[in-house]
């Protein structure tokens, strides 16, 4: 887990993955696909391709997709197969060595891999592998799979698919892997189904991606999701499926719907915008407010705010405007400058909020500092009352499955009641969506709500 001196008052996802098979200029399509997944990770990115002679090529670096790749670097990535990755560091510290995809050389054939998620028994597996002579090139938990694959192949002389199946069965936690050999791509998802991974068709080839929004930008057609516990093999035969493990449960991360995924993505048959809008409607049913207008915190909360307004009959207004030009890192050297951070990112529309009783809808509250500043900002702009409504339950506990949730002590709802949080953020009222409401918004019978209810689907090896 990376430790930053100054941490934003928002959650971050670990990463996004992409795979392209059987398409001319696979790297070019990977570039646009990764750009569509940029919201899942902004610290670094990379692409690996397999050239016409079976050789592997890689370009990776710190920064956004548009910063790492240019016309010159793209010419270094020939071939009809590619995998790519965008990263926000979680398990493993910052550093170029931790940027994915990883590339490995082995006597049974080179391969590359990239992952979205977090392996909870990483430290135990790494210790065992290092005791047996494995040398790690990074501190990323994703590298464990590569060493397990190699170890299986050496010890048991297994075909690659059997080595992969055995290796995946040794992992516990959340993962959505893309693994590329010289001839095929494997798409693998953990048996709990924590994070999304979808398959699409493009021309005579195929694409896999963390979100379906990547399909739209490259002109691919959605086929289906990779199922929990499934390995999908993509090669000249087309797509083939086998399960390395029986699915445990459909424990899709609730925050994928609430915050991380793009509104135009579909996750397991549910459109993200529709989920958020429905959550806003349910939020009104659970926690109505006597108010004049409804506004949302840009951008991820706008759909929920629309739903709340629709259900309440109140006007939906653009009461907050988000600046497009604030840098993504935004780490300032003094407290006084950091206090101005929210005002640089968000500005109230005075003519809309002045004299109004305002319902402000947000997706979540992490530390509460941003909520406090937004409430103050609206009051300074003339709002008569500010009623805060959150389109998820109180965030109380650490995530071990690929979301950079702060330590429990940093989470304002971990140590305070709803009434206390309301006072701390200086709102006139505060209400959160219930656990039941989060499920109902997507017509789901199950989601991973561990960061809300402390019910973890897996054993926690590091507790």
Can you annotate each of these PLM segments?
Residues 1-228, 233-291, 297, 385:
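Conserved short alpha-helical segments that host acidic/polar catalytic motifs at enzyme active sites
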Residues 25-27, 90-91, 121, 186, ...:
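Flexible loop/turn segments at secondary-structure boundaries
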Residues 69, 138, 143-146, 316-327, ...:
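A conserved beta-strand->alpha-helix junction
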Residues 114, 180, 188-189, 200, ...:
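Generic beta-strand/beta-sheet core signal
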Residues 134, 155, 286-292, 310-317, ...:
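Secondary-structure transition/capping motifs at alpha-helix termini
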Residues 166, 213-214, 221-222, 226-230, ...:
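Phosphate/diphosphate-binding loops
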Residues 168, 183-184, 201, 219-225, ...:
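PRPP-dependent phosphoribosyltransferase catalytic core
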Residues 313-358, 369, 396-406:
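Short, glycine/charge-rich flexible loops or terminal/linker lids adjacent to PRPP-binding catalytic cores
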């Amino acid at each position: 887990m990376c430790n930053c001196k100054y941490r934003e008052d928002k959650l971050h996802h670990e990463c996004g993955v992409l795979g392209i098979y059987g398409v001319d200029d696979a790297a070019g399509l990977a570039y646009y696909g990764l750009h569509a997944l940029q919201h899942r990770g902004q610290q670094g990115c990379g692409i690996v391709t397999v050239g016409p002679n079976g050789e592997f090529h890689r370009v990776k670096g710190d920064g956004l997709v548009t910063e790492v790749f240019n016309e010159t670097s793209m010419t270094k990535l020939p071939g009809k197969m590619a995998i790519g990755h965008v990263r926000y560091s979680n398990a493993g510290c910052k550093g170029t060595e931790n940027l994915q995809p990883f590339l490995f050389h082995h006597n049974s054939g080179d391969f590359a891999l990239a992952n979205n998620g977090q392996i909870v028994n990483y430290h135990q597996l790494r210790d065992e592998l290092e005791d047996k002579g494995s040398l790690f090139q990074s501190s990323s938990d994703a590298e464990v799979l590569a060493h397990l694959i190699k170890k299986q192949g050496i010890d048991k002389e297994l075909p690659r698919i059997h080595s992969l199946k055995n290796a995946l069965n040794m992992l516990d936690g959340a993962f959505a892997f893309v693994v590329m050999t010289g001839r095929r791509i494997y798409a693998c998802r953990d048996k709990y189904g924590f994070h999304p991974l979808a398959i699409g068709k493009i021309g005579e080839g195929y694409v896999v991606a963390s979100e379906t929004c990547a399909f739209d930008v490259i002109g691919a057609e959605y086929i289906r999701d990779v199922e929990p516990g499934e390995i999908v093999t993509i090669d000249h035969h087309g797509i083939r499926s086998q399960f390395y493990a029986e699915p445990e449960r459909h424990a899709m991360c609730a925050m994928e719907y609430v915050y991380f995924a793009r509104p135009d993505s579909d996750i397991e048959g549910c459109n993200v915008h529709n989920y958020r809008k429905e959550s806003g409607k349910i939020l009104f049913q659970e926690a109505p407010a006597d108010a004049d207008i409804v506004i949302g915190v840009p951008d991820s909360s706008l759909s929920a705010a629309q739903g709340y307004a629709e259900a309440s009959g109140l006007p939906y207004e653009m009461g907050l405007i988000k600046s497009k030009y604030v840098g993504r890192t935004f780490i300032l050297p003094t407290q006084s400058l950091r206090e101005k951070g929210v005002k640089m990112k968000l500005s109230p529309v005075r003519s809309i909020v002045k004299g109004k009783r305002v319902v402000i809808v947000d997706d979540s509250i992490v530390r509460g500092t941003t909520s406090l500043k937004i409430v103050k900002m609206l009051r300074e702009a003339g709002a008569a009352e500010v009623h805060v409504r959150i389109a998820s339950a109180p965030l109380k506990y650490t995530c071990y499955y690929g979301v950079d949730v702060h330590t429990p002590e940093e989470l304002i709802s971990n140590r305070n009641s709803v009434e206390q949080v309301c006072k701390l953020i200086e709102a006139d009222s505060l209400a959160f969506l219930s656990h039941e409401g989060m499920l109902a918004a997507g017509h789901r019978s199950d989601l991973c709500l561990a960061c809300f209810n402390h019910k973890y689907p897996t054993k926690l090896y590091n507790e």
